[in-house]
Amino acid sequence: MRFETTVQRPVEASGVGLHSGVPVKIRILPAPVSTGVVFVRTDLDGFQIPASWRHVARVSYATSLMRQGVLISTTEHLLSVFYSMGIDNVYVEIDNLEVPILDGSGLPFVKLIAQAGIRQYRRKRRYLRIRRPISVEDKGKRISILPDEAFRLTCDTEYPAPVGRQSLELVVTPEHYASELAFARTFGWENDLDQMRNMGLIRGASLANAVCFTSEGPLNPDGLRAVDECCRHKALDLIGDLALLGRPLLGHVIAERAGHAMHAALVARIMGDPSIYEIITFDQLASRVTQALVS
Protein backbone atom coordinates (compact mmCIF):
# COMPACT_ATOMS: atom_id res chain seq x y z
CA MET A 1 0.00 0.00 0.00
CA ARG A 2 1.25 3.46 -0.87
CA PHE A 3 -0.62 5.57 1.68
CA GLU A 4 -1.51 5.33 5.37
CA THR A 5 -4.96 4.00 6.22
CA THR A 6 -7.67 3.92 8.84
CA VAL A 7 -11.18 2.47 8.99
CA GLN A 8 -14.04 4.33 7.34
CA ARG A 9 -16.57 3.85 10.13
CA PRO A 10 -16.71 2.48 13.69
CA VAL A 11 -17.43 -1.22 14.25
CA GLU A 12 -17.76 -3.24 17.42
CA ALA A 13 -17.67 -6.76 18.80
CA SER A 14 -18.13 -8.40 22.17
CA GLY A 15 -17.15 -11.68 23.77
CA VAL A 16 -15.04 -13.00 26.63
CA GLY A 17 -11.34 -12.91 27.39
CA LEU A 18 -9.60 -16.22 26.72
CA HIS A 19 -7.58 -16.16 29.93
CA SER A 20 -9.58 -13.83 32.20
CA GLY A 21 -13.00 -15.16 31.24
CA VAL A 22 -14.45 -11.67 31.71
CA PRO A 23 -17.06 -10.18 29.33
CA VAL A 24 -15.54 -7.49 27.12
CA LYS A 25 -16.64 -5.19 24.32
CA ILE A 26 -14.43 -3.44 21.79
CA ARG A 27 -15.10 -0.63 19.32
CA ILE A 28 -12.71 0.04 16.45
CA LEU A 29 -12.74 3.69 15.40
CA PRO A 30 -10.96 5.85 12.80
CA ALA A 31 -7.81 7.61 13.99
CA PRO A 32 -5.79 10.49 12.48
CA VAL A 33 -2.70 10.10 10.32
CA SER A 34 0.35 8.63 12.09
CA THR A 35 -1.60 7.73 15.24
CA GLY A 36 -0.86 4.02 14.98
CA VAL A 37 -2.98 1.51 16.89
CA VAL A 38 -4.02 2.81 20.30
CA PHE A 39 -6.00 0.86 22.89
CA VAL A 40 -8.38 3.02 24.94
CA ARG A 41 -9.59 1.62 28.28
CA THR A 42 -13.10 3.07 28.46
CA ASP A 43 -13.54 1.54 31.92
CA LEU A 44 -10.57 3.63 33.13
CA ASP A 45 -11.51 7.12 31.93
CA GLY A 46 -10.18 6.55 28.43
CA PHE A 47 -6.62 5.64 29.47
CA GLN A 48 -4.56 5.03 26.32
CA ILE A 49 -2.00 2.31 25.62
CA PRO A 50 -0.27 2.52 22.22
CA ALA A 51 0.41 -0.83 20.55
CA SER A 52 4.19 -0.53 20.74
CA TRP A 53 7.10 -2.78 21.59
CA ARG A 54 7.94 -0.30 24.35
CA HIS A 55 4.85 -1.38 26.28
CA VAL A 56 5.29 -5.17 26.11
CA ALA A 57 4.74 -6.48 29.63
CA ARG A 58 3.99 -10.20 29.51
CA VAL A 59 4.73 -12.79 26.85
CA SER A 60 3.68 -16.06 28.50
CA TYR A 61 0.80 -17.76 26.64
CA ALA A 62 -0.23 -14.38 25.15
CA THR A 63 1.15 -10.90 24.54
CA SER A 64 0.14 -8.21 27.01
CA LEU A 65 0.83 -4.49 26.95
CA MET A 66 1.12 -2.24 29.99
CA ARG A 67 1.48 1.49 30.51
CA GLN A 68 1.62 3.09 33.95
CA GLY A 69 0.32 -0.12 35.49
CA VAL A 70 -2.69 -0.41 33.17
CA LEU A 71 -2.89 -3.67 31.21
CA ILE A 72 -4.26 -4.85 27.88
CA SER A 73 -3.82 -8.59 27.36
CA THR A 74 -4.06 -11.07 24.49
CA THR A 75 -3.50 -8.40 21.86
CA GLU A 76 -1.92 -10.60 19.19
CA HIS A 77 -4.96 -11.73 17.17
CA LEU A 78 -6.40 -8.25 16.69
CA LEU A 79 -3.00 -6.70 15.97
CA SER A 80 -2.27 -9.50 13.51
CA VAL A 81 -5.37 -8.60 11.53
CA PHE A 82 -4.64 -4.86 11.53
CA TYR A 83 -1.03 -5.46 10.44
CA SER A 84 -1.85 -7.93 7.68
CA MET A 85 -4.90 -6.13 6.33
CA GLY A 86 -3.02 -2.84 6.09
CA ILE A 87 -4.74 -0.88 8.87
CA ASP A 88 -2.28 1.71 10.18
CA ASN A 89 -4.30 4.04 12.41
CA VAL A 90 -7.18 3.09 14.73
CA TYR A 91 -8.45 3.62 18.23
CA VAL A 92 -9.58 0.40 19.91
CA GLU A 93 -11.98 1.21 22.72
CA ILE A 94 -12.13 -1.66 25.20
CA ASP A 95 -14.07 -1.89 28.45
CA ASN A 96 -11.97 -4.51 30.24
CA LEU A 97 -8.42 -5.80 30.43
CA GLU A 98 -8.39 -8.46 27.68
CA VAL A 99 -9.22 -8.41 23.97
CA PRO A 100 -12.15 -10.80 23.33
CA ILE A 101 -11.15 -14.16 21.91
CA LEU A 102 -14.30 -14.47 19.73
CA ASP A 103 -13.89 -17.78 17.84
CA GLY A 104 -10.17 -18.09 18.64
CA SER A 105 -8.98 -16.98 15.20
CA GLY A 106 -8.49 -13.72 13.31
CA LEU A 107 -11.44 -14.29 11.01
CA PRO A 108 -14.08 -12.37 13.01
CA PHE A 109 -11.75 -9.36 13.08
CA VAL A 110 -11.16 -9.62 9.32
CA LYS A 111 -14.93 -9.53 8.85
CA LEU A 112 -15.13 -6.48 11.13
CA ILE A 113 -12.57 -4.66 8.97
CA ALA A 114 -14.56 -5.54 5.85
CA GLN A 115 -17.65 -4.13 7.55
CA ALA A 116 -15.81 -0.96 8.59
CA GLY A 117 -14.20 -0.33 5.21
CA ILE A 118 -10.72 1.10 4.67
CA ARG A 119 -9.97 4.78 4.13
CA GLN A 120 -6.68 5.99 2.65
CA TYR A 121 -4.99 9.19 3.76
CA ARG A 122 -2.65 11.21 1.58
CA ARG A 123 0.30 10.58 3.89
CA LYS A 124 2.75 8.14 2.34
CA ARG A 125 3.22 4.91 4.25
CA ARG A 126 6.68 4.45 5.75
CA TYR A 127 8.01 0.89 5.85
CA LEU A 128 10.59 -0.67 8.16
CA ARG A 129 13.00 -2.48 5.84
CA ILE A 130 15.52 -4.94 7.28
CA ARG A 131 19.08 -4.23 6.12
CA ARG A 132 21.00 -7.18 7.57
CA PRO A 133 20.26 -10.62 9.02
CA ILE A 134 19.83 -11.11 12.76
CA SER A 135 18.59 -13.98 14.90
CA VAL A 136 17.57 -14.86 18.44
CA GLU A 137 18.08 -18.39 19.81
CA ASP A 138 17.13 -20.15 23.03
CA LYS A 139 17.10 -23.84 23.96
CA GLY A 140 16.76 -25.20 20.43
CA LYS A 141 14.30 -22.52 19.35
CA ARG A 142 15.23 -19.81 16.90
CA ILE A 143 13.78 -16.79 15.13
CA SER A 144 15.63 -14.92 12.39
CA ILE A 145 14.96 -12.10 9.99
CA LEU A 146 16.61 -11.52 6.62
CA PRO A 147 16.44 -8.61 4.18
CA ASP A 148 13.57 -8.89 1.69
CA GLU A 149 11.54 -6.54 -0.48
CA ALA A 150 8.28 -8.08 0.81
CA PHE A 151 6.94 -9.23 4.17
CA ARG A 152 7.64 -12.97 4.07
CA LEU A 153 7.17 -15.65 6.73
CA THR A 154 8.57 -19.12 7.17
CA CYS A 155 7.12 -20.85 10.21
CA ASP A 156 8.18 -24.29 11.51
CA THR A 157 6.39 -25.80 14.51
CA GLU A 158 6.68 -29.05 16.45
CA TYR A 159 4.13 -30.34 18.96
CA PRO A 160 3.18 -33.69 20.51
CA ALA A 161 1.10 -36.18 18.56
CA PRO A 162 -1.22 -35.97 16.79
CA VAL A 163 0.01 -32.55 15.57
CA GLY A 164 3.70 -33.31 15.03
CA ARG A 165 5.90 -31.14 12.81
CA GLN A 166 4.37 -28.60 10.45
CA SER A 167 5.75 -25.83 8.26
CA LEU A 168 4.41 -22.91 6.28
CA GLU A 169 5.83 -20.21 4.03
CA LEU A 170 3.99 -17.28 2.51
CA VAL A 171 4.24 -13.65 1.52
CA VAL A 172 1.95 -11.70 3.83
CA THR A 173 -0.59 -9.69 1.86
CA PRO A 174 -4.19 -8.86 2.80
CA GLU A 175 -5.41 -11.46 0.33
CA HIS A 176 -3.07 -14.23 1.49
CA TYR A 177 -3.76 -13.48 5.13
CA ALA A 178 -7.54 -13.56 4.74
CA SER A 179 -7.48 -16.87 2.87
CA GLU A 180 -4.51 -18.70 4.42
CA LEU A 181 -4.13 -17.61 8.05
CA ALA A 182 -7.10 -15.70 9.44
CA PHE A 183 -9.26 -18.79 10.05
CA ALA A 184 -6.67 -20.63 12.18
CA ARG A 185 -7.69 -20.93 15.85
CA THR A 186 -5.76 -20.95 19.08
CA PHE A 187 -5.15 -24.45 20.45
CA GLY A 188 -4.03 -26.52 23.40
CA TRP A 189 -3.97 -30.01 24.94
CA GLU A 190 -6.54 -31.58 27.24
CA ASN A 191 -3.89 -32.83 29.67
CA ASP A 192 -2.66 -29.24 30.21
CA LEU A 193 -6.05 -27.75 31.09
CA ASP A 194 -6.00 -28.22 34.87
CA GLN A 195 -2.48 -26.85 35.22
CA MET A 196 -3.29 -23.78 33.12
CA ARG A 197 -6.48 -23.08 35.06
CA ASN A 198 -4.53 -23.35 38.32
CA MET A 199 -2.23 -20.67 36.88
CA GLY A 200 -5.23 -18.39 36.36
CA LEU A 201 -5.30 -18.96 32.59
CA ILE A 202 -7.90 -20.09 29.99
CA ARG A 203 -10.87 -19.22 32.21
CA GLY A 204 -12.80 -18.22 29.09
CA ALA A 205 -11.69 -21.12 26.89
CA SER A 206 -14.18 -23.52 25.30
CA LEU A 207 -14.51 -25.62 22.19
CA ALA A 208 -16.26 -22.62 20.65
CA ASN A 209 -13.07 -20.54 20.75
CA ALA A 210 -10.14 -22.98 20.80
CA VAL A 211 -9.02 -26.32 19.43
CA CYS A 212 -8.42 -28.86 22.20
CA PHE A 213 -6.30 -31.93 21.39
CA THR A 214 -6.07 -35.34 22.97
CA SER A 215 -3.57 -37.95 21.80
CA GLU A 216 -6.28 -39.17 19.43
CA GLY A 217 -7.07 -35.82 17.79
CA PRO A 218 -9.17 -32.70 18.33
CA LEU A 219 -12.16 -32.82 20.67
CA ASN A 220 -13.96 -30.18 18.61
CA PRO A 221 -17.02 -31.73 16.90
CA ASP A 222 -16.21 -30.04 13.59
CA GLY A 223 -12.55 -31.03 13.67
CA LEU A 224 -9.82 -28.85 12.19
CA ARG A 225 -10.17 -26.07 9.64
CA ALA A 226 -6.91 -27.21 8.01
CA VAL A 227 -4.53 -30.11 8.60
CA ASP A 228 -1.83 -27.61 9.59
CA GLU A 229 -4.14 -25.24 11.48
CA CYS A 230 -1.73 -25.11 14.43
CA CYS A 231 1.18 -23.89 12.32
CA ARG A 232 -1.07 -21.36 10.59
CA HIS A 233 -2.21 -20.03 13.94
CA LYS A 234 1.38 -19.65 15.15
CA ALA A 235 2.08 -17.62 12.01
CA LEU A 236 -0.97 -15.48 12.83
CA ASP A 237 0.37 -14.93 16.36
CA LEU A 238 3.82 -14.07 15.04
CA ILE A 239 2.41 -11.36 12.78
CA GLY A 240 0.49 -9.88 15.71
CA ASP A 241 3.68 -9.65 17.77
CA LEU A 242 5.61 -8.14 14.84
CA ALA A 243 2.91 -5.47 14.60
CA LEU A 244 4.47 -3.95 17.71
CA LEU A 245 7.29 -2.70 15.47
CA GLY A 246 4.86 0.10 14.67
CA ARG A 247 5.48 0.15 10.92
CA PRO A 248 4.80 -2.30 8.08
CA LEU A 249 7.71 -4.69 7.74
CA LEU A 250 9.86 -5.59 4.75
CA GLY A 251 11.84 -8.67 5.66
CA HIS A 252 11.79 -12.47 5.73
CA VAL A 253 11.04 -13.81 9.21
CA ILE A 254 11.98 -17.44 9.86
CA ALA A 255 10.51 -18.86 13.07
CA GLU A 256 11.58 -22.30 14.27
CA ARG A 257 9.49 -23.44 17.26
CA ALA A 258 9.37 -19.83 18.46
CA GLY A 259 6.71 -18.30 20.70
CA HIS A 260 5.63 -14.94 22.08
CA ALA A 261 8.78 -14.44 24.18
CA MET A 262 11.10 -14.97 21.23
CA HIS A 263 8.93 -12.81 18.98
CA ALA A 264 9.22 -10.00 21.54
CA ALA A 265 12.98 -10.51 21.83
CA LEU A 266 13.39 -10.20 18.05
CA VAL A 267 11.32 -7.01 17.94
CA ALA A 268 13.32 -5.50 20.81
CA ARG A 269 16.58 -6.48 19.10
CA ILE A 270 15.51 -4.80 15.85
CA MET A 271 14.27 -1.61 17.48
CA GLY A 272 17.28 -1.41 19.78
CA ASP A 273 19.76 -1.13 16.89
CA PRO A 274 18.95 1.37 14.10
CA SER A 275 21.70 -0.13 11.93
CA ILE A 276 19.50 -3.21 11.44
CA TYR A 277 16.79 -1.36 9.52
CA GLU A 278 15.91 1.68 7.45
CA ILE A 279 12.63 3.57 7.04
CA ILE A 280 11.52 3.99 3.42
CA THR A 281 8.35 4.95 1.55
CA PHE A 282 6.47 2.80 -0.93
CA ASP A 283 7.74 5.01 -3.78
CA GLN A 284 11.36 4.54 -2.69
CA LEU A 285 10.84 0.79 -2.52
CA ALA A 286 9.22 0.71 -5.98
CA SER A 287 12.08 2.75 -7.42
CA ARG A 288 14.67 0.34 -6.02
CA VAL A 289 12.84 -2.69 -7.37
CA THR A 290 12.59 -1.06 -10.80
CA GLN A 291 16.30 -0.21 -10.81
CA ALA A 292 17.17 -3.78 -9.84
CA LEU A 293 15.09 -5.17 -12.70
CA VAL A 294 16.69 -2.80 -15.22
CA SER A 295 20.28 -3.33 -14.09
UniProtKB/Swiss-Prot annotation:
Pathway given in the UniProt record: Glycolipid biosynthesis; lipid IV(A) biosynthesis; lipid IV(A) from (3R)-3-hydroxytetradecanoyl-[acyl-carrier-protein] and UDP-N-acetyl-alpha-D-glucosamine: step 2/6
Names of the cofactor(s): Zn(2+)
Active site: H260 (proton donor)
Keywords recorded for this protein, A-Z: Hydrolase, Lipid A biosynthesis, Lipid biosynthesis, Lipid metabolism, Metal-binding, Zinc
Catalytic reactions of this protein: a UDP-3-O-[(3R)-3-hydroxyacyl]-N-acetyl-alpha-D-glucosamine + H2O = a UDP-3-O-[(3R)-3-hydroxyacyl]-alpha-D-glucosamine + acetate
Protein task: Catalyzes the hydrolysis of UDP-3-O-myristoyl-N-acetylglucosamine to form UDP-3-O-myristoylglucosamine and acetate, the committed step in lipid A biosynthesis.
Family indicated by similarity: Belongs to the LpxC family.
Listed name of the protein: UDP-3-O-acyl-N-acetylglucosamine deacetylase
